């Protein structure tokens, strides 16, 4: 009776209560249901958290567009999750992909999330949807300061459909190929972090570099007020940016848009970054612990491990910065906490607290030393999503292959794993390697194809014009601006070729402070 589609909806209204009692399986746990629903509410704070974190990291004249994009990405992705995303990621299908059987929440009522689950699928539905939302928000931030809003929403919709949903299925579905292989990933080191990091790398390559402005000591800065000195429209598309990065296209702007120096715009509001990261940290406690979908001793291990790892990550980053510069950095400490959260996400349900410490220290060390990775590889990935989430997720998966312990997994009374190198299970690292390489490759290639195809659609070119980039995306795409800017203002400071003083371009342009840029 339970598996009969929409059985409850066909009952007479007078017998609804009796029917629910009849259909509600005895194995469902009210405590587990309550905890997953509570976790859903807490995890939702990751949406404003990522938005504030990213908005504080960009120039002021593009900050509000990042906030708006995060809001719209949440709406677009959750609609996708409702229409068919949940079904593709969670319904029983092949070893690679789910089916459309539960699209539109069809056949989704009191059925268990998976056979033997203590919660119904309807309880998991919003919780799992917020994982997809967080992943899309992380990767879509790569459009910062030069990407157009509407194409970014289209790309996010396609990314969740073609990248996140299959990878979530591989990782967590009972018959997903990575799950059956034996690769360990508790809460999304692959589908969430590695996937979003490599997708952000592909998106950034398609968008190309930001224009370097207001830096008179840089030879590749814009130093002329003549619009003719800006790159032509033929150089401002996805295909040309790929050719330029691979060295197949020689253009007069290659110093600015090919391999070499990239724009360095300092975060406009470190306080906004701090608030955003605190919200992310808070949400991640339930992001990880809620993934168990039940409440027991292992739940406590997971939450404790999350706090330990992020704390070690923040402190490690702070110590390295102080050794290098003899000063602490608010932004650096926040990035260290993020690195710790990324590192513990795949491992939180499989390691003892000492393993969680390693899961915070090692990713923070690696990500800090690779802080200039974008400069080395010639990619202008504005918010360092690839560094923190892509590289950090891989490092976290490797650490998991070393420190995974079967006793922690078994603390819920049901889970059995062989563990990692710490218990002499040498094959585990091979399984981890298969997991993060397949996720990284699939995410990078499919996202690049998505961006290339969307860019070819009339009206959906993914990058703003260079003139629009100079004005700021807030002025181009939004009715409102943050305090201190007006719709008539164009905060452009461009250094003239023969002058030491900044000049403004256009008759109605107000000169703004450099920190307003």
Curated annotation (Swiss-Prot):
The chain crosses the membrane at residues 33-53, 70-90, 119-139, 149-169, 181-201, 273-293, 300-320, 328-348, 350-370, 385-405, 433-453. It comes from the Eukaryota. GO terms for cellular component: fungal-type vacuole; plasma membrane. Keywords: Ammonia transport, Membrane, Transmembrane, Transmembrane helix, Transport. It is found in: Membrane. Pfam families: Ammonium_transp (PF00909). GO terms for biological process: ammonium transmembrane transport; methylammonium transmembrane transport. One of its GO terms (molecular function) is ammonium channel activity. SUPFAM superfamilies: Ammonium transporter (SSF111352). InterPro entries: Ammonium/urea_transptr, Ammonium_transpt, NH4_transpt_AmtB-like_dom. It is a multi-pass membrane protein. Residues 1-32, 91-118, 170-180, 294-299, 349, 406-432 are extracellular. Residues 54-69, 140-148, 202-272, 321-327, 371-384, 454-517 are cytoplasmic. The keyword Iron-sulfur does not apply. PANTHER family: AMMONIUM TRANSPORTER 3, AMMONIUM TRANSPORTER MEP2. Belongs to the ammonia transporter channel (TC 1.A.11.2) family. Transporter for ammonium to use as a nitrogen source. This is Ammonium transporter 3. The gene is amt3.
């Amino acid at each position: 009776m339970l598996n009969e589609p929409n059985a409850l909806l066909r009952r007479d209204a007078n017998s609804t209560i009796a029917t629910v009692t009849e259909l509600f399986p005895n194995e469902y746990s009210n405590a587990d249901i309550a905890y997953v629903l509570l976790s859903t509410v807490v995890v939702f704070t990751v949406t404003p958290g990522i938005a504030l974190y990213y908005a504080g990291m960009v120039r002021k004249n593009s900050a509000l567009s990042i906030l708006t994009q995060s809001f719209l990405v949440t709406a677009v992705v959750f609609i996708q999750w409702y229409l068919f995303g949940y079904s593709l990621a969670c319904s029983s299908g092949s070893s690679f992909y789910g089916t459309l059987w539960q699209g539109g929440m069809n056949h989704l009522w009191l059925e268990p999330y998976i056979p033997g689950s203590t919660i119904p699928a309807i309880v998991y539905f919003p919780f799992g949807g917020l994982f997809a939302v967080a992943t899309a928000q992380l990767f879509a931030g790569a459009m910062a300061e030069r990407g157009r809003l509407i194409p970014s929403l289209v790309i996010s919709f396609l990314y969740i459909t073609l990248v996140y949903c299959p990878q979530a299925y591989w990782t967590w579905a009972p018959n997903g190929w990575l799950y059956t292989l034996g690769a360990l990933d508790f809460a999304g080191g692959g589908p969430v972090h590695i996937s979003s990091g490599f997708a952000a790398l592909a998106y950034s390559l398609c968008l190309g570099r930001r224009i370097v402005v207001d830096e008179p000591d840089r030879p590749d800065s814009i130093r002329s007020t003549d619009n003719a000195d800006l790159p032509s429209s033929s150089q401002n598309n996805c295909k040309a940016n790929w050719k330029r990065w691979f060295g197949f296209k020689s253009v007069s702007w290659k110093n600015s848009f090919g391999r070499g120096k990239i724009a360095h715009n300092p975060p406009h509001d470190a306080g906004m970054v701090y608030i955003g990261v605190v919200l992310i940290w808070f949400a991640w406690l339930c992001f990880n612990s809620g993934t168990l979908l039940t409440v027991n001793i292992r739940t406590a291990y997971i939450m404790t491990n999350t706090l330990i790892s992020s704390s070690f990550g923040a402190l490690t980053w702070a110590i390295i910065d102080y050794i290098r510069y003899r000063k602490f950095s608010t932004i650096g400490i926040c990035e260290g906490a993020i690195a710790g959260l990324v590192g513990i996400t795949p491992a939180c349900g499989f390691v003892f607290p000492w393993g969680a410490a390693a899961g915070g220290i090692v990713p923070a060390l690696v990500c800090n030393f690779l802080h200039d990775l974008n400069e080395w590889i010639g990619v202008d990935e504005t918010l360092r999503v690839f560094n923190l989430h892509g590289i950090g997720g891989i490092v976290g998966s490797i650490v998991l292959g070393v420190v995974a312990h079967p006793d922690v997994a078994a603390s819920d009374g049901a889970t059995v794993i062989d563990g990692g190198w710490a218990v002499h299970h040498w094959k585990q690292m091979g399984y981890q390697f298969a997991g993060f390489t397949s996720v990284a490759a699939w995410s990078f290639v499919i996202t690049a194809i998505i961006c290339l195809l969307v860019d070819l659609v009339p009206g959906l070119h993914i990058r703003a014009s260079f003139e629009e980039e100079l004005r700021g995306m807030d002025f181009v795409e939004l009715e409102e601006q943050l305090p201190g800017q007006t719709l008539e203002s164009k905060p452009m400071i461009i250094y003239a070729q023969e002058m030491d003083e900044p000049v403004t371009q256009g008759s109605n342009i107000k000169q703004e402070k450099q920190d307003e840029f």
